[in-house]
From Swiss-Prot:
HAMAP family: Ribosomal_uS4_A (MF_01306_A)
Phylogenetic placement of the source organism: Archaea, Methanobacteriati, Methanobacteriota, Stenosarchaea group, Methanomicrobia
PANTHER family registered for this protein in UniProt: 30S 40S RIBOSOMAL PROTEIN, 40S RIBOSOMAL PROTEIN S9
Biased composition regions of type Basic and acidic residues, renumbered to the chain: 169-181
Protein's UniProt name: Small ribosomal subunit protein uS4
Keyword entries, A-Z: Ribonucleoprotein, Ribosomal protein, RNA-binding, rRNA-binding
Function according to Swiss-Prot or TrEMBL: One of the primary rRNA binding proteins, it binds directly to 16S rRNA where it nucleates assembly of the body of the 30S subunit. With S5 and S12 plays an important role in translational accuracy.
GO biological process annotation, one example: ribosomal small subunit biogenesis
GO cellular component: small ribosomal subunit
Domain S4 RNA-binding, first and last residues per copy: 108-177
Keyword 4Fe-4S set for record: no
Subunit structure: Part of the 30S ribosomal subunit. Contacts protein S5. The interaction surface between S4 and S5 is involved in control of translational fidelity.
Protein source organism: Methanosphaerula palustris (strain ATCC BAA-1556 / DSM 19958 / E1-9c)
């Protein structure tokens, strides 16, 4: 057993807690994506903040350094990572990292993907299905709604093998099949 390290928050709360416009925007996002609370919005904002900071540091490094190989390596590392997790396309540039919106990391959540693929009627139901263990990625049960689905796994989302939702007689499956016809 090692030293567990210092516990730190994965988000930063807003500086002004009672800013009307921000509260309305966050509430709209919470409803649209079926999030549990505003903390999940702040966590997504923190993720974006880290990527933007890395892009700004890379731009500063590009203006200071003349080592083209090191610049290319750092740029390829950042853009490759964002491409693998699905936030950017394969032909993206550093400017695209700076223009990322809050919706993009929220669209990569398992809960949102389950809803968008039609496996659930609403984002809230998608969250419930994930937490109850009815959803699998490549045959492995995933019960974390905030799991960030990598680009190569987004087509592998399905119902878990032993879930009652896999039987043809289940009302939810009948509803989905009727909707697809």
């Amino acid at each position: 057993m090692g030293y567990p390290g210092k516990n730190t928050k994965g988000y930063e709360a807003p500086k002004r807690p009672f800013e009307k416009q921000r509260i309305e925007d966050e509430t709209r996002i919470v409803i649209e994506y079926g999030l549990r609370n505003k903390r999940e919005v702040w966590r997504a904002q923190s993720v974006l903040r880290r990527y933007r900071k890395a892009a700004r540091e890379l731009l500063a490094f590009m203006s200071q350094s003349s080592d083209e190989q090191q610049i290319a390596t750092k740029k390829e590392h950042l853009l490759g990572h964002l491409n693998r997790i699905g936030l950017l396309g394969p032909d993206a540039d550093i400017g695209d990292v700076l223009s990322l919106k809050i919706q993009q990391p929220l669209e990569r959540r398992l809960q949102t993907m389950v809803y968008r693929q039609g496996l659930a009627r609403s984002p809230k139901q998608a969250r419930q299905m994930v937490t109850h263990g009815h959803i699998a990625i490549a045959g492995r049960r995933v019960d974390i709604p905030s799991y960030r689905v990598p680009r190569d796994q987004e087509t592998l989302i399905s119902y878990y093998g032993t879930s009652p939702l896999t039987s043809e007689g289940h009302p939810e499956i009948e509803r989905i099949n009727k909707k697809r016809r």
